[in-house]
Amino acid sequence: MLPLTLLNATQGRPILVELKNGETFNGHLENCDNYMNLTLREVIRTMPDGDKFFRLPECYIRGNNIKYLRIQDEVLSQVAKQQAQQRENRGSRFRGRGQRGRGNYGHTAPNRRGRGRGGHM
């Protein structure tokens, strides 16, 4: 599973984010982008030593600072089911297309040289 797929499925749900500097943020995921930048709401920020807590209405976390993400187990199972279903649907779409190959496609014309860029003989 790709992390962005999981993050998109987690929007609106609780998430724990640990940064490289040791700070942790607990809140509800509001938004994420392709760089894994996150916007959280109703956030509790914990300092690395664990002795200071801050309550924030909203915060923005830059993706390159993220060390660890923890999401709910039900989100993991939900995304796994969706991806399995997509794989099944994808498999039946292209059945029977690999028989042609390259060449004259059943025409009976004699084998001719391509028309390329000149090179007449």
Curated annotation (Swiss-Prot):
Keywords: Cytoplasm, mRNA processing, mRNA splicing, Nucleus, Ribonucleoprotein, RNA-binding, Spliceosome
Primary localization: nucleus
Family: Belongs to the snRNP Sm proteins family.
Gene Ontology annotations for the cellular component aspect, listed alphabetically: cytosol; Lsm1-7-Pat1 complex; Lsm2-8 complex; nucleolus; nucleus; P-body; spliceosomal complex; spliceosomal tri-snRNP complex
Name this polypeptide is given: LSM complex subunit lsm4
PANTHER family attached to this UniProt entry: SMALL NUCLEAR RIBONUCLEOPROTEIN SM (PTHR23338)
Signal peptide: none
Record localization: Nucleus; Cytoplasm
Swiss-Prot/TrEMBL GO biological process terms: nuclear-transcribed mRNA catabolic process; P-body assembly; RNA folding; spliceosomal snRNP assembly; telomerase holoenzyme complex assembly
Organism: Schizosaccharomyces pombe (strain 972 / ATCC 24843)
MF terms (GO), sorted A to Z: U2 snRNA binding; U6 snRNA binding
Quaternary structure annotation from Swiss-Prot or TrEMBL: Component of the heptameric LSM1-LSM7 complex that forms a seven-membered ring structure with a donut shape. The LSm subunits are arranged in the order lsm1, lsm2, lsm3, lsm6, lsm5, lsm7 and lsm4. Component of the heptameric LSM2-LSM8 complex that forms a seven-membered ring structure with a donut shape. The LSm subunits are arranged in the order lsm8, lsm2, lsm3, lsm6, lsm5, lsm7 and lsm4.
Regions of compositional bias (Basic residues) in chain numbering: 110-121
The keyword RNA-binding is annotated on this UniProt entry: yes
